[in-house]
A protein has these predicted regions:
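Conserved functional hotspot residues or short segments at active or partner-binding sites
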Residues: 343-344, 348-527
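Hydrophobic beta-strand signal
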Residues: 127-128, 254, 305, 330, ...
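Cleft-lining beta-strand/loop regions that shape enzyme active-site pockets
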Residues: 20-31, 35-52, 75, 105-108, ...
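Bacterial Sec-dependent N-terminal signal peptides
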Residues: 1-28
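Extended, small/polar residue-biased N-terminal targeting/export presequences
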Residues: 46-107, 153-185, 509-520, 527
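Flexible, acidic/glycine-enriched loop-and-adjacent beta/alpha segments
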Residues: 305-337, 350-364, 370-377
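Residue-level recognition of conserved beta-strand edge/terminus positions
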Residues: 129-130, 161, 347, 395
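Structural motif
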Residues: 123-125
Length: 527
């Protein structure tokens, strides 16, 4: 490690920066030479032993912290986990699970996945992996996942407890590639109006959205609500492909510009397949990066309108620079700009990450989430859309065409605490585990469930009682009534998710989402 650091730094920078024609200044007083000497001196001369790997990692993080808020360093393990969520697959056994009473409860096996193929079903409890008990031993979720995952083709032996069967069951599961979907929901929210919710922009997102659009068109969709609320972004190429489907060939989607990265434009490569029909894009303060690229392009090209609240404002182009050990630097090299010229990135000061991290809190305190008039926009931030020349504003993030305030009264403090303490989800999972077959038998059709099912009030009362044990109590009768009302809806959505899928969850929950309902009103009434 002693002399290796200097070599690695030079070789790494020489390779990764060649395309930008950057020059590394070497010599007795060069920054790189100084950094290498410092590390070697500490490793060899410091009074106590040091972890050289941690020393170098901390030095890298220290340098990046002086830059913009999003340049970052991740370890090999962190990099792998981050990439898996976007790359479309990972190797494993293919189950969605949750921990209940210190045991692993299977929520759903992945369709055609390794576990479903050998007969594992929803409601099974996995109690041992390769003869190692995982139930009743206080094992972390991360440790359990490590035991369940493994290279494709390898075998894992599972011991399962199934409701109604006295003896434990044994399954021999061959690990395989497990798809990671990024689309949360797709359904007809009203006659003629389709709804798609995308959670992130991953490798498979364009295909997922394409399949959903084709399916919804067959069901009579003429207009679309494209929900990007809470979408934290993902791959630029995926965002460009999806935006392309709504635009005409040659339309500008986004461009980038930076000190060492000259302007690069991303345009629609062909006429999109979904250019007709009204389009409403939904955003909120947690919509970021690729979600802002798509919503900004749709708005600037006058293809549709944006409904909701101002987006996060993350518009930095980052280049991944990977080390041989799998760790990675993600270095900001440019900014994203919408077709009208708005910079998506909100303002920041180099090195002041704490202030930047408090931005959403400050926006909330200043009333931006609840009152549109609290957002003060100067004429210098004024831009115009490309076709209808409507006024839109820059300054960071995408400002919606139709503002929807955050309802701060809907979820009471009591409700938030019951959810945060996992009291709601734990009771929900136990209830579903006990009544799964009964519910499946009674509600073979989701439409019937949506229209007629009501959560037993005894379940709500059990949650309230457990909350009381944790000193979670209502301020008054009004708060208790409000808490019970939305607990019932939340529990119905959770039951729908675990009996069917996330799409059914959102079909229940969206009827209480003000931004979604505003979009429905806009498409049905025109105002």
């Amino acid at each position: 490690m002693k002399k290796y650091l200097l070599f690695v730094l030079v070789a790494f920078l020489a390779v990764t920066s060649a395309s930008a024609q950057m020059r590394i200044r070497m010599g007795k007083n060069s920054p790189i030479e100084k950094l290498g000497r410092a590390e070697i001196a500490i490793a060899n001369l410091y009074v106590d032993s040091v972890d050289e790997n941690k020393l170098v990692e901390d030095a890298i993080r220290g340098m990046l912290e002086k830059l913009d808020p999003h340049s970052s360093y991740t370890t090999a393990k962190e990099t792998q986990a981050m990439n898996e969520s976007l790359n479309g697959s990972f190797d494993g056994i293919g189950v969605q699970f949750n921990m209940v009473d210190d045991s692993l409860l299977v929520i759903q096996p992945v369709v055609n996945g390794p576990s479903e193929k050998v007969g594992i079903i929803a409601g099974d409890r996995i109690v041992a992996v390769n003869d190692t008990a995982i139930a009743g031993v206080k094992m972390s979720k991360e440790e359990i996942m490590k035991r369940l995952r493994g290279p494709k083709g390898t075998i894992v032996n599972l011991t399962v407890v199934r409701r109604g069967i006295k003896d434990k069951l044994s399954f021999r599961v061959k690990r395989d590639k497990i798809p990671v979907t990024t689309m949360d929901a797709a359904y007809m929210i009203r006659p003629g109006i389709g709804y798609i919710r995308l959670g992130s922009f991953g490798m498979t997102s364009h295909k997922e959205v394409s399949v959903a659009m084709d399916s919804l068109k067959k069901k009579g969709m003429k207009d679309l609500i494209f929900d990007l609320q809470d979408n934290g972004g993902g791959y630029l190429q995926t965002a460009a492909k999806i935006a392309n489907e709504f635009l005409e060939k040659g339309d500008l989607i986004v461009y980038t510009n930076g000190r060492t990265a000259p302007r690069q434009e991303f345009r629609a490569e062909a006429n999109g397949r979904w250019r007709k029909g009204k389009l409403v894009v939904l955003t909120n303060e947690f919509s970021a990066s690729a979600a802002e690229i798509v919503s900004g392009a749709i708005q600037d090209q006058d293809r549709g309108v944006v409904v909701g609240r101002r987006t996060f404002g993350k518009g930095l182009v980052q280049r991944p620079l990977t080390f041989e050990d799998g760790s990675e630097i993600r270095l900001t090299i440019a900014h994203y700009y919408t077709p009208s010229g708005r910079c998506i990135q909100k303002p920041y000061k180099k090195g002041e990450r704490e202030d930047y991290a408090m931005d959403l809190d400050n926006r909330y305190k200043h009333g931006e989430f609840t009152n549109q008039d609290s957002i003060h926009l100067s004429d210098s931030l004024k831009y115009y859309t490309l076709r209808k020349h409507r006024v839109v504003y820059g300054g960071g993030g995408i400002m919606p065409d139709y503002f929807v305030p955050l309802d701060t009264t809907k979820y009471t403090k009591m409700h938030r605490l019951l959810t945060a303490k996992s009291i709601v989800i734990n009771h929900s999972l136990k209830f579903i585990d006990a009544h799964r077959q009964e519910l499946k038998s009674q509600y073979k059709d989701f439409g019937k469930f949506l229209a007629t099912y009501e959560v037993p009030q005894s379940l709500v009362e059990e949650i309230i009682a457990d909350g009381k044990k944790e000193k979670i109590e209502p301020r008054d009768a009004a708060e208790l009534a409000q808490t019970k009302k939305y607990l019932s809806i939340q529990l119905k959505a959770l039951v729908a998710r675990d009996i069917w899928d996330m799409s059914q969850y959102f079909q229940v929950w969206n009827e209480t989402n003000e931004i979604v309902m505003r979009a429905v009103k806009l498409l049905t009434t025109g105002k």
